[in-house]
Amino acid sequence: AVEYAIGDTTTKWVAERAKNGHPAPFPLKYIEIGNEDFGPVYWERYEKIYQALSTKYPDLIYIANSVIRVVGRENDDKRKDIPNFVNPKNVKVFDEHYYNSIEWACEQHYRFENYKRGVADLFIGELGISGKYPYNLLATGAIRMSIERNGDLNPLFAERPVMRHWDFLEHRIFLPMLINGVDSSVKTSFFYLAKMFRDHTFDVCLDAAIKDMEGMQNIFVTMGYDTGSKQYILKLINLQDKKVTLQPEVSGFKRPVKAHKTSLVLVPGKENT
């Protein structure tokens, strides 16, 4: 499959690719070795597969798997298993999967600040927060704030599930970004949350806090500066059932500034909207 996707023009599989109407190589960048695999057998096999692939395709980035469950304390760094790999230096990107509750997700708002640097890049390949809508969606955003605040981990994030058919929504814990039918599809609130994070990125993280936060542990905030657009971006998530008046504390502003607000308003009980 790799040779078919990016091999040179002299090989059999590239000839097949051209024959199928795609003479140019596909933009393959990453290969994940395994899926939710871990333990001594996997650590050994990862090294063998890594050596075979990286020798032939040195420009690709290889992703390793982590333990599925959270071991020990809820905020344990799953990457503590990296030293158990045959050659830890060959673990360039580490895939972490999380399935947990709304309460757990809110507790992880500062999770990645505590990660050891200089190890492997961070990849959240699967994230599923179960619980009552829309709090599960908002709690997902609280974790995403922690991911984007820690850009020095070179984080990657994969949205899932991307799409699900109307007929298979019943009893599903994790809702998709898109719901499709025979001739149409609908964007869900999960899609719009992802879009808001995508459309409002920053490359410089700044300190921000909410004044008088005592008793308001369901409010989450993060802030940064986008050097490309020269804009300051402040993000707020409110998991409460009511509107609240907040006074953000942001250092560095000497005078009032104009601001543009983008809101995602969610209605309890309307999961598929």
Description of each model-found segment:
Residues 35, 66, 98, 126, ...:
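Active-site proximal loops enriched in glycine and acidic residues that flank catalytic Cys/His/Asp
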Residues 119-223, 227-230:
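Aromatic/acidic polysaccharide-binding cleft in carbohydrate-active enzymes
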Residues 253-273:
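Acidic, Ser/Thr/Pro-rich beta/coil linker or hinge segments at domain junctions
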